[in-house]
A protein has these predicted regions:
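RNase H-like, Mg2+-dependent phosphodiesterase core
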Residues: 1-191
Length: 191
């Protein structure tokens, strides 16, 4: 069985990432739970351990794709991409949340708060979170004014201050309200 979870759904900037994880039968992971509740450094160590003891894959959906559709579709697409990349096909994939990807030959079961209930979903949550956080840290080096190395693209006060002062980048999600409002106000200013 595989566990699948996505991260970055509520961010104002950056892609959505998902991971699909099939844990080795003999693995024992202490302290595994929802990735958002684990300190950053411990998450990195857990991610490395999980990767060594599993079959896993990561899928992502770019900001360009998110801007063309909606965040729910993007989240499901990232999960679908992760599942399709798995080198081993699971009999069933347990998906965190109420929705599962469509048009995929793997049987999917949704589990509300699955990252708190099923170990392979929690493992997927950790791998997805670490992968996306590291991506945003790297991207933040090119755009230091938004402090993505600390907020990872979420709508923190620092990020919102950066948006107000410097405007948006191509990595911001144009349909998300704070970004959309900035675009509208800029349009009004130029008319």
């Amino acid at each position: 069985m595989a566990g699948v979870d996505e991260v970055g759904r509520g961010c104002l900037a950056g892609p959505v990432f998902a991971a699909a994880v099939i844990l080795n039968d003999n693995i024992s992971i202490k302290g595994i739970k929802d990735s958002k509740k684990i300190p950053f450094k411990k998450r990195i160590l857990l991610s490395k351990y999980i990767k060594k003891n599993s079959v896993y894959a990561i899928g992502s959906v770019s900001v360009k794709e998110i801007n063309k559709t909606n965040i729910l579709h993007a989240s499901l697409l990232s999960m679908k991409r992760a599942l399709k990349k798995l080198k081993q096909e699971p009999a069933v994939a347990y998906i965190d949340g109420p929705f599962a990807p469509k048009n995929i030959k793997i049987k999917c079961k949704t589990v509300i708060k699955g990252d708190e209930k099923i170990t392979c979903i929690a493992a997927a949550s950790i791998i997805a979170k670490v992968s996306r956080d590291l991506f945003m840290i790297k991207l933040g080096r090119k755009y230091p004014k938004y402090l993505w190395n600390k907020n990872f693209g979420y709508g923190t006060n620092d990020h919102l201050r950066g948006l107000k002062k410097y405007g948006i980048t191509k990595h911001h999600r144009k349909k998300f309200r704070p970004i959309h409002n900035i675009l509208i106000s800029k349009t009004r200013e130029t008319q």
